Amino acid sequence: MDNLVVLDFGSNSVRFSINQITGKNTFKEILRRKATTRLAEGMGLTAGEKRLTPAAIKRTLAAVADFKKIYQQYSNYQVVGIATAAVREAVNRKSLIDQVYQQTGCRLQVLSAHEETYFDYLAVMNSLLLKDCLIFDIGGGSCELALVKSGKFQTGVSLPFGAVSLGEKFTAANLTAAKLFALQTFLRKQFSALFWLQQASDLPLVLLGGCNRSVARIKRTELKLQPIDSFHGFKMTTKDFTEIYQRLLGLDNQQRKQVPGMEAMRSDIILAGMTPVILLLQQLHCSQVVFSESGAREGFIYQQLSQ
């Protein structure tokens, strides 16, 4: 195997990357693609069992078909796949898993909450020069927090909400003052139960996830930094992060789509994705955030290569 193809099924988007194996425990990403499929769409609106909708499955399989046309052009490759919160929580996940297998020959590995958190840790530790930090990955259907001290994983948690599910629950596309208050109250209750979070006071907050990537793009566009998508290790003060949040709060969804650097497909959920960060920055008195392009997918690759 020269190339490892990784399919990554998230709650908001499905991604794939082609990674050239360059040596023991080392790889070089040579291609990355993404399709916004909103796999978790509708899952947070009903009580009881969570189900992937037929429309979301159809969008996702269409994206996989497009990806397959690309990776088949490469030689000597192996296809592996991971899935996170949306698939993990869906009672009908087998339907998607079976259809992906029929389409690609790849049997999806549905990551447990702990695996997703730990793979975030592996990715950050192998790609950023940080020894002490709090890692915060905001996905579409879940949030992962990992406390790192002296480069070692201390503790972590996966919380069962993310930008898509929070956006649906609190109507974040058109966030009223009442909805914002309800969202903040909900999040404070979740964070207050994590007593170990206080050990992260004053540490850098490492941010992963699509909404956080959008914030980095907005700031890099403001600063005229090129390329705007190259933000691994990019740092932003808490003051600057808060200013962007406050500015976006004052805009409606159509206006947010026009903000330079904003991904139009995230304009309706970005406030739901930023609000948990704002509350943590306030609670832990963090002075800055650091953005990571590497997440659970890259951590999964490191784990695969170490076996």
Tell me what each language-model feature is:
Residues 2-101:
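Conserved phosphate-binding loops in N-terminal lobes of ATP-dependent enzymes
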Residues 1-29, 124, 128-159, 210-214:
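Gly/Thr-rich phosphate-binding beta-strand-loop-beta motif of the actin/hexokinase/Hsp70
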Residues 37-39, 138, 161:
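Hydrophobic residues in beta-strands and at strand termini
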